Regions:
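Conserved catalytic or regulatory cores that recognize and/or transform ribose-phosphate-containing ligands
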Residues: 35, 48, 63-65
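Generic alpha-helical secondary structure signal
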Residues: 27, 53, 63-66
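Short arginine-rich
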Residues: 60-75
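A short, exposed loop/beta-hairpin motif centered on an aromatic-Gly-Thr core
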Residues: 38-58
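Short N-terminal "domain-start" leader segments
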Residues: 1-33
């Protein structure tokens, strides 16, 4: 199994958002990915990034959007 490096994990309501660095079969870094996992078992890769800075910024923007959506639902 190839390693992955997780830079962030957040849980918002019934969803979890995770951003990780994935590696190729030869253990060379491949890409950063942000995934959303739902309690019902559904999951989806929502973004891919080239750099760690892009991954952090992208992850934070998804978290912000999910928080806004949740706050709108609760209002």
């Amino acid at each position: 199994m190839n390693p992955s490096v997780q830079i962030s994990l957040n849980r918002i309501g019934d969803r979890e958002i995770s951003t990780v660095l994935l590696y190729r079969f030869d253990n060379e870094p491949r890409a950063w990915e942000t995934c959303i996992f739902e309690d019902n078992g559904n999951s989806d890769v929502v973004a891919r990034y080239v750099t760690e800075a892009e991954a952090i910024a992208g992850h934070n923007s998804y978290v912000f959007a999910m928080l806004q959506e949740r706050n709108t639902q609760l209002a």
